Amino acid sequence: MEHKEVVLLLLLFLKSGQGEPLDDYVNTQGPSLFSVTKKQLGAGSREECAAKCEEDKEFTCRAFQYHSKEQQCVIMAENRKSSIIIRMRDAVLFEK
């Protein structure tokens, strides 16, 4: 194998280990959380919302909801184990 091929394979291997932003979350259609510690942010996609959850410094983000019609992202410190669940038809809940 030539040096270039080895480098290319190594780069592909390293890139594949990063995964997608949503891979760390379990998503459920329908539930919404009643959360005291939360932030409402604008986001153009679920992936962008996941990135905002990961990057938040004010609290440990354990879940987020993305509302595609409004392009609204709600990041929360609680998850279904520590909060009350409310049913919402258009909500998708992502939890760690």
Curated annotation (Swiss-Prot):
It comes from the Eukaryota. It is found in: Secreted. The keyword Signal applies. Keywords: Disulfide bond, Secreted, Signal. May bind noncovalently to lysine binding sites present in the kringle structures of plasminogen. This may interfere with the binding of fibrin or alpha-2-antiplasmin to plasminogen and may result in the localization of activity at sites necessary for extracellular matrix destruction. Residues 20-96 form the PAN domain. This is Plasminogen-like protein B. GO terms for cellular component: extracellular region. The lineage of its organism: Eukaryota, Metazoa, Chordata, Craniata, Vertebrata. The gene is PLGLB1. InterPro entries: Pan_app, Plasminogen-rel. Residues 1-19 form the signal peptide. Disulfide bonds join C49-C73, C53-C61.
